[in-house]
Amino acid sequence: MAELKNDRYLRALLKQPVDMTPVWMMRQAGRYLPEYKATRAQAGDFMSLCKNHELACEVTLQPLRRYELDAAILFSDILTVPDAMGLGLYFEAGEGPRFERPTDTIDAIKKLSIPDPEDELGYVMKAVSTIRRELNGAVPLIGFSGSPWTLATYMVEGGSSKTFEKIKKMAYAEPAALHMLLDKLADSVILYLNAQVANGAQSLMIFDSWGGALSHTAYREFSLRYMQKIVDGLTRFADGRQVPVTLFTKGGGLWLEAMAETGCDALGLDWTVDIADARRRVGHKVALQGNMDPSMLYAPIPRIEEEVSQILAGYGEGTGHVFNLGHGIHQHVDPEHAGAFIKAVHAQSKQYHK
């Protein structure tokens, strides 16, 4: 494998000195870019794009051609794992992801098998190895998965949900059934992420998009417990260097201390968290990623630059901060505004790394 030319992102996650704060954007390969829309049209639909390793590689690299980003993230979807378990993933216009066969009974959960990442998810591994080769050491490649709780919400609800009624009913009325599902998902995610590392991923991220829907105690029981199991089972060293792991619970600002206890290297912060407060609470244990409100990219460029300045000042001096948005970039953002955001992070952060 080619030697890394820019390892700023990996170094910041491991709290090693950097010359400036690294930056990337969640969903940086996405619908705000005209070139992404063209490639997606060529693929036919979203899942066909995910399953074609050459096109998945192309869209992963597109934002890196435009911007001086410090990391690439695999173009895929968190629902590849449940899809590989045989649930029949499809996308309904205006409705988002749906499953033909939800796992809303104990019998359905018992029948689930753990997918082989090199077989049922082989298309993802082919994308990882292709992207890693094409990056040629320019920046590190991030692999990722959804958290067991977040994947389970889609599997039990049969798709997206605003209320999480079915899965919460299972959590409180049939907890043994939900624990069985979460355990299978944790085992599946461990295999899936370790296979991504074996195929070239240099950092890992676990997206717990819906952990914030849980109560204080339920979060620990149904979400954090299974992310802990995953962290314990991950390959943390490959290609002669550490493979950092980042946990991100959207709406998880209450639980940063508990998340930092898992042994992960970094925590993702959404935009509701004060980064200065987060650093005071857990900065001695973990690096922090975040956390500008993605909607700020709709603001005039001087306002974006001002927000970047405030977040950098909030984190303060020294390493251990990866700048990002607090969630994925919105599809209607002007690509020039995204570019101004990235430039502002690099230009303004040098003063904090003397």
From Swiss-Prot:
Gene3D superfamilies: 3.20.20.210. Its main location: cytoplasm. Pathway: Porphyrin-containing compound metabolism; protoporphyrin-IX biosynthesis; coproporphyrinogen-III from 5-aminolevulinate: step 4/4. It catalyses: uroporphyrinogen III + 4 H(+) = coproporphyrinogen III + 4 CO2. Signal peptide: none annotated. It is found in: Cytoplasm. Catalyzes the decarboxylation of four acetate groups of uroporphyrinogen-III to yield coproporphyrinogen-III. This is Uroporphyrinogen decarboxylase.
